[in-house]
């Protein structure tokens, strides 16, 4: 793709970089942001980065700047705090109605809600004694259908089977 075509997606790409590559402990300065954009075939000048960050801030994104040596920009506010994501991961892993495969998929999706660095902290194993994981891959869909029926005020019938 020619570099000029990449300019249309520059603002969104810059936001994705800040979401994935920054947190309070991992900052990116303007030259690093320019380099990461260039890796995505997007040309950027130093002045345009400042303008783009101002635009993102005006759109409600909490992008902070730490000045001085080792300083740079980071996305300060996210939908979930890291501690909240850890709680959700623990709940998913401890749930007996969620299969190990589905747990892994859900945790991977939760990792996308924080920086790459914080995401590695979500890879933890919770063991609940005496609570086996379900083998059913369709159990979540069944639970969702049950909730939908209850919310719609519909009658629900169960058919039990052994094993």
Enumerate the language-model features and the residues they cover.
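Short, basic/aromatic recognition patches that contact phosphate-bearing ligands
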Residues: 1-90
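Bulky hydrophobic/aromatic content
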Residues: 79-161
